[in-house]
């Protein structure tokens, strides 16, 4: 099949790629752009591991064709942190032990970011409702709820100097979508 030229805005930068028109946004992000923080999960839209933000709204990248988001801003877990600091959600997930195996964490972080962008101080019920489409088989969700509450309560300064202190501890790497060696999780 003939590849189609696509221009996407991903994590604040325009990216032009040639992709198969039947590929999903998940496949384009991972295989064409090398952004492997977004995970293959069920590929049926049931687990939330592939959640990214499109214009600030969480969507399932496994069910979305990239041609549908060409004029939108796509944010992946790699776009959460700045060059200087991790996002407060990433810090809170690490501190609260909400990133157990780390596989669901990128999708969970993106859903939580969308919630906090629209609801400054969400209730536990609002958090539970927001992340209800993100499955985690390791944590039991309490640590995830607490991490989101902690990030909501922060002033945005959490983790401001962590990037300059050398290699990140394992929980912080997992909260950013990488494994013990710093390589992206599959």
Name the predicted role of every residue range.
Residues 1-163, 170-173, 179-186:
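Signature of N-terminal electron-transfer/Fe-S-associated modules in redox systems
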